[in-house]
């Protein structure tokens, strides 16, 4: 649903390709309710006059891996054009830290196969300052990252990471994250 709006608003051929290819499997996907939420963009689709761009690009044409060093995110896929056979890894080590709506999850990863989560962050946001949000959802322990002597990462702009090195190859790809600024070493002394 969001890809459809992105395709229309930004005239984005890749978002249009995603919508087209998903609709090949489920032609009614855009007319189904999405968790009964108003954010499913039904109203947008009913009122917009913007057309979705033509299906001119295929997802197979995208690179299997992409690292966005400026934001500290990386995505790696095995078969991006066929999501039912695709293994995907997402990685985050962000120079923006864990401020505002961000989480203390530097050097965290998530894995998916066939569009379904295999290793994924736990928890959900119930309120910005409730115990669950502070001790689980926003905390490092709720993500696929390491704790140092049982301690999580800093929450704030000072708790940042970055991606100093990565490689995108035909047979193997990797990403290295440096989260040393996200961890307080004072408790180790």
Q: What kind of region is each of these model predictions?
A:
Residues 1-38:
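C-terminal, helix-dominated tail/subdomain
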Residues 29-189:
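Catalytic and substrate-binding regions of extracellular carbohydrate-active enzymes
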């Amino acid at each position: 649903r969001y890809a459809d709006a992105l395709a229309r608003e930004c005239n984005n051929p890749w978002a249009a390709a995603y919508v087209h290819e998903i609709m090949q499997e489920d032609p009614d996907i855009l007319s189904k309710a999405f968790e009964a939420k108003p954010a499913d963009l039904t109203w947008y689709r009913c009122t917009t006059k913007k057309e979705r761009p033509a299906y001119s690009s295929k997802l197979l044409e995208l690179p299997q891996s992409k690292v966005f060093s400026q934001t500290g995110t990386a995505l790696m896929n095995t078969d991006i054009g066929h999501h039912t056979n695709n293994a995907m890894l997402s990685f985050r080590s962000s120079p923006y830290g864990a401020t505002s709506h961000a989480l203390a999850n530097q050097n965290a990863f998530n894995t998916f196969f066939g569009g379904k989560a295999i290793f994924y962050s736990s928890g959900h946001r119930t309120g910005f300052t409730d115990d669950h949000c502070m001790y689980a959802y926003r905390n490092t322990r709720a993500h696929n990252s390491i704790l140092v002597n049982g301690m999580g990462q800093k929450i704030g702009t000072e708790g940042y990471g970055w991606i100093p090195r990565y490689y995108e190859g035909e047979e193997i790809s990797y990403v290295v994250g440096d989260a040393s600024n996200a961890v307080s070493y004072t408790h180790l002394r």
